[in-house]
C-alpha cells in the first residue's frame, strides 16, 4: 500500500501498475470534500512513485455516484470567490489525474455519474462492465457539470453526442456509451479489472497510443466554422423546446460547449466554472437540489420503515377496471404476485387488458420482452370470489368512491383474509377513521391512495388512522416502495394531504371565474408562467368534473368555515350541464381524438356562454393576480397541514406536491417557494387578498415566522 485514507487506497502490483481504489466508509463512493482532498494527496504520491500505469476502481458495487449533494446548498450560499476556489481546486485534482506521466484506465461498475463520470473522462481509457450506468445528470439539479465534463466529453465523443448527454442528464447504458466512443470496452463483471489491466499493458507495449488519446481531450474541438454554427444553433432550438424558459441549465450547457469549442483545456475550464457558479446561485438550482435531498429523505424513511414491516409476498386488489388494473400491473411488474378481485367479469377483463396494454407498450419500446410480459401477466390472478385471498399478506380495496360500498367490502374481506393480513383502502377523500368503523381490527387498516394513472404517478399517500398500528403503516410504506412508488405518510383528515391542498386552489380558480375570469387565459398563465403541467380548468377536465364535484362537497363538509360555499360555482355549472370533462368529450374544453389517437382539446364557445349566464360579462385579470388568487389558498392550506401534523415535514409536503400534483419542480414545492419568496413577503401578499375569505387568511404561526424573518427549511 503506497497511500491510504478513509476513502481511497492505492497499492502497487509487482508489475508496477497502481490500483487506486475508491472505498469510502458509507454505502457508496462520492466526491465530498474529504474524498477530493484524498484523491489530490493520492495523485501526488502516484506521480512521485515508480508506477508505470494506473487503474481507477471501486471497492463498492458501484463506482462513484457523483459529488456530495448534501454539501451543495451550504456551499452555494458562499460568496462567488469561495465557490470559485472550491471548483477550481477540484479541477486542479482532475487535471492532475489527467496529467499523470503514464497511461490510466477506469474500471467502471455500477454508477459513474456526475463527478464520477468526470473522473473517468480524465483517464486515458475506460472499461465498463455490463452493470455500468454512465452520465452527467447535473442539469436535473439546475447545474452543468463542474469538474470538466463540458470540456472533455465533447472532445471525446463530439459536440452533438455530448450535448445530448449533458442537456438530458440521462444515464447511459454501457453499450450505448461504447457506440459513441465514451468508453473503450464492455466486459462481464468478473473480467472487469483484468480487461482494464490488459488495456494498460497494451498501452505500455505501444499497441494503444495513450498520449494521442490524452492530447485530443485537451485540444480545441475540431469542427469547421459553418458546421459548428449550424450544430449549435440546432442544439439550442431543440434544447429550448424541451427545457423551456424555467430551466436555464440545459441552454447554459449548450452555450458553454459552443463558447469553449475553440479553446484549450485551461481556457475552456474557466468558461465552465463561471457558468457553473452563475447557475449555482439561482433559485432553480436551490429548488431542484432541494427536491433531490427531499427525495432522499423520503426514501430513507421508507427504507427505515421496511425494518418494521411484514414481508409482503402476495397481494390482492379489490375492484378491477382501470385503477385496479393499474395497481395489479404495478405490483406484478415489480415482483409481487397479486389477485385482482371483482364481482363483474367485464371489469376483470378491463383490468387484465389494462395491465396487458401497459406491458405491450413496454415491449414495443424495447423496455421489456414478450417473455417478461407473460411472466408479469401470470403474476396477476383474476378472481370473481374471495377464495384466492385467504393467503395474501395485503389487500388494497379500490372499489367505487362511496363510503357505504367501501365499508361493506372491507367488512367482507376482513372475514376472508388471514388475521395478520393488512387491509388498505385506495380512497382519495373518504375518512380512514370512518371506514375503520366497519372493521373488527382497525389496527391493521390504513389508507393507500394511488394517483391516476398509477403506472405514471410516483406518489402514494399512506394514511394513518387513529387506530392504525405502526407495523401496518411500515408494511404499506414498504409495499409501496417495492412497487416503485414514493410513499409519504400522512394523518387522516378530509382529503388527506394532496386533495386537501388541491381544492383550495380550485376554489381560487372558481373565484376568478365568478368575477368574470377567462378559464383558458387562467390556464395559460398557470401553465406558461407559473409552470404547472396543466392549468386548473384542464386539470379538472382530466380528473373529471363529476369527481371534482363530489370531492369538493366532501371538502366543504370537512372544512365548512373555509371551503363551504353557498353560491353555485363553475364546477357546479359544468357538472349540472353534464359536461364531465375528457371522459365524455366536453368540460371546460371540448375534446376530440387526433390522428395519433390522443385526446385533443379546443376551447368550446358553449362553455363561455354557460359561464357568462352564471357569472356575467368576462373580465381580464393580470397574470400576477391570477397566480396570487389561485396559489395563496393552496399555500396556506399546505402550511395548515404542517401545523396540524397531517404531514410530518416541509420536505415530505413538497415531495407530495411535486410527485402527486406536478407542482413545478423548478419552484421546489410550496415550502421552498415560500422560503424563496420570503415568508414576510407572502404574508403581505395574502393580506392584500384577505377580503376574499377564509382561504386567504394566513395562520398566526405564519405571521410569527414572518416577523422573525424565519424560513421553513434551515438557512444554509
Curated annotation (Swiss-Prot):
It comes from the Bacteria. Pathway: Lipid metabolism; fatty acid beta-oxidation. Residues 310-716 are annotated as: 3-hydroxyacyl-CoA dehydrogenase. Keywords: Fatty acid metabolism, Isomerase, Lipid degradation, Lipid metabolism, Lyase, Multifunctional enzyme, NAD, Oxidoreductase. GO terms for cellular component: fatty acid beta-oxidation multienzyme complex. Residues 1-188 are annotated as: Enoyl-CoA hydratase/isomerase. Its EC number is 4.2.1.17, 5.1.2.3, 5.3.3.8, 1.1.1.35. Substrate binds at residues 295, 499, 659. The keyword Lyase applies. The keyword Lipid metabolism applies. GO terms for molecular function: 3-hydroxybutyryl-CoA epimerase activity; delta(3)-delta(2)-enoyl-CoA isomerase activity; enoyl-CoA hydratase activity; long-chain-3-hydroxyacyl-CoA dehydrogenase activity; NAD+ binding. It holds the Pfam family 3HCDH. InterPro entries: 3-OHacyl-CoA_DH_CS (IPR006180), 3-OHacyl-CoA_DH_NAD-bd (IPR006176), 3HC_DH_C (IPR006108), 6-PGluconate_DH-like_C_sf (IPR008927), ClpP/crotonase-like_dom_sf (IPR029045), Enoyl-CoA_hydra/iso (IPR001753), FA_oxidation_alpha_subunit (IPR050136), FadB (IPR012799). It catalyses: a (3S)-3-hydroxyacyl-CoA + NAD(+) = a 3-oxoacyl-CoA + NADH + H(+); a (3S)-3-hydroxyacyl-CoA = a (2E)-enoyl-CoA + H2O; a 4-saturated-(3S)-3-hydroxyacyl-CoA = a (3E)-enoyl-CoA + H2O; (3S)-3-hydroxybutanoyl-CoA = (3R)-3-hydroxybutanoyl-CoA. Heterotetramer of two alpha chains (FadB) and two beta chains (FadA). NCBIfam families: FadB, PRK11730.1. In the N-terminal section; belongs to the enoyl-CoA hydratase/isomerase family. In the C-terminal section; belongs to the 3-hydroxyacyl-CoA dehydrogenase family. This is Fatty acid oxidation complex subunit alpha.
